[in-house]
């Protein structure tokens, strides 16, 4: 019985070894084993445009807020160039075409506001002259100032003094008109400055889109070297 068990154990061992030898032969010859790449793996290089945009914005915001309109226009131009560096090619072209449609309307509005401001400023000057003259006339008659004409003193006639109430009303109206014109002119100046800033931003954006990469930088940047027309 013991010899039978030993023989059976030997048979099972031989069968097991034979199965292990036959397993590699079942692999197909035409199957290719995956090999690692022969080059060092590398991820795609990140775009440099966000860095350029941040550098441009840093340049625009390095100083204090622009005190003059020229400085404000300069910062608006820097912001537009930063926007071009941040946007992709398709968005740049969409914004460019929209800006080309809006710019003539903005310039027309700007011209109209300038004409309106000129009219209001002229009205302000006329009202200031009227207020000054009426103030002098009223003050002279109230103080009974005497004028020397050809060596003789001439006082303000009584009929002129009777005009003081009317001159006071005219002076009050001229002063009120001056205040209204000054307030309107300040509001127009703010609108004109805002439109000028928008015109500068849109023109700068379009100029940046049209700019070739050789003008923008010696290193090709994303999309700037091939502006679409």
UniProtKB/Swiss-Prot annotation:
Keywords assigned by UniProt, alphabetized: Host cell membrane, Host Golgi apparatus, Host membrane, Host-virus interaction, Inhibition of host innate immune response by virus, Membrane, Transmembrane, Transmembrane helix, Viral immunoevasion
Comp. bias regions, Low complexity: 36-46
Transmembrane portions of the chain: 119-139, 162-182
Extent of Basic and acidic residues compositional bias: 13-31
Region (Disordered): 13-46
GO biological process terms held by the UniProt record: symbiont-mediated suppression of host innate immune response
Annotated membrane topology: Multi-pass membrane protein
Subcellular location(s) per record: Host cell membrane; Host Golgi apparatus
A Pfam family that the UniProt record links to this protein: Orbi_NS3
Transmembrane helix keyword on record: yes
UniProt KW Membrane keyword: yes
Disulfide bonding pattern of the chain: none
Function: Plays a role in the inhibition of host innate immune response. Interacts with host OPTN and thus inhibits the recruitment of TBK1 to the host Golgi apparatus. In turn, downstream partner IRF3 cannot be activated and IFN-beta production is impaired.
Family assignment from sequence similarity: Belongs to the orbivirus NS3 family.
Subunit structure: Forms homooligomers via coiled-coil motif. Interacts with host OPTN; this interaction inhibits innate immune response.
Protein name listed in UniProt: Non-structural protein P8
Organism per entry: Bluetongue virus 11 (isolate USA)
Gene: Segment-10
């Amino acid at each position: 019985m013991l010899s039978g068990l030993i023989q059976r154990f030997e048979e099972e061992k031989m069968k097991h070894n034979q199965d292990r030898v036959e397993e590699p032969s079942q692999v197909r010859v035409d199957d290719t084993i995956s090999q690692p790449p022969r080059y060092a793996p590398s991820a795609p290089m990140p775009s440099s445009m966000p860095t350029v945009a941040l550098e441009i914005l840093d340049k625009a915001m390095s100083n204090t807020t622009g005190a003059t309109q020229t400085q404000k226009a300069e910062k608006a131009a820097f912001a537009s160039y930063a926007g071009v560096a941040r946007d992709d090619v398709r968005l740049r072209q969409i914004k460019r075409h929209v800006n080309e449609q809006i710019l003539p309307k903005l310039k027309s509005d700007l011209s109209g506001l300038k004409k309106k401001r000129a009219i209001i400023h002229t009205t302000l000057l006329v009202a200031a002259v009227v207020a000054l003259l009426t103030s002098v006339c009223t003050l002279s008659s109230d103080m009974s100032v005497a004028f020397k004409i050809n060596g003789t003193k001439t006082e303000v006639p009584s009929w002129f003094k009777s005009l003081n109430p009317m001159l006071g009303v005219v002076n009050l109206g001229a002063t009120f008109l001056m205040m209204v014109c000054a307030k309107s002119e300040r509001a127009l100046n703010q609108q004109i400055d805002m439109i000028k800033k928008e015109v500068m931003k849109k023109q700068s954006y379009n100029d940046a889109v049209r700019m070739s990469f050789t003008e923008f930088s010696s290193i090709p940047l994303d999309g700037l070297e091939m502006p679409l027309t």
